[in-house]
Each structure stands twice: as structure tokens, then as C-alpha cells.
Amino acid sequence: MSMLKWFAALALVSLLAQPCLAADPAPIVGVWKLVSFEREYQAGGEREYPMGKAPTGYILFLPEGRMTVVITGEGRTAPTTDQDRAGLYNTLVAYTGRYRVEGDKWITTLDVSANPAWVGTEQARSFRIDGNRLQEMTAWVARPDNRMARAVITYERAK
């Protein structure tokens, strides 16, 4: 076998031995500021604002593959009772983990979350980028009233 063929074969074997790489995460890498948090119902497209019309938050995607999100609902105030403190949980979304991009989805393996049931799970989100806007869509899930809904969360690239 000629040296050139040997190197070509070695290169091919090396390439095939590499793990499958996910889509390029570069478009979502960075810091994004929350614009809106809506719940959309599948039947009829009705939308509501479970975090209020002016929630606050950020989502960060690092090039190393770590993401973090913190979202708080509109009108949160300092708690004065245990009941107040417990109520704040209903207006908080916070988690972090390792993410990968696969097509139009990012999938995060959570290692920390305000919701302990999410720790160790994979959370998949569909997304699209339009200019400086990032729109995140959760999977459709059945609400307590059995209607199917998802969160549609919009961010803009932070300056």
C-alpha cells in the first residue's frame, strides 16, 4: 500500500471513529434577554401570560456547551411569610446543564434546577432565530384541564 493510500485510509478511519457531532451551536451562543413568556394552546392558538406581561430573565449559552436560564414573573415582591416564599416558586424558572444542538432543537441535560424533578433529565426545546431574536418553544403538554399547551419564550440578544 502506498504511503498516500495509507494516510487516506487512516484519515478515513479517524473520521469515522469520531462521535457524531450535533449541529453547530454558534447561532445560539451568547447572552439573550427575555422579551416575553407566553403559553400557547394548540386548539385555537389562544395565548396567555403565566409570568405576566413583563417578566424578567436571561438565557446564556456558552461555547463550551453549558447553558443557564433564569426567568422570574412580573410583580414579584420580597416575601414576608412562608406562604409568600412558597408562592414565589410559581413565578421562577431556573436551571443549568450541558446542552447540544440537533437541528432546530437544543437538548439540555440538567444538573441543577429550581425544580428538583428536572435534575438529571434531558429537556428539549425547539428554537428559531430571526435577526437578534431567539424564540424557544417547549413540547406540547396536557394542562390540568386536558388542553394541550406549550410555552413560547422570546429573547433578544443582549447588548
Task: Describe each PLM feature range.
Residues 9-13, 18-159:
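Lipid interaction determinants
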Residues 1-8:
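Bacterial N-terminal signal peptides that target proteins for export
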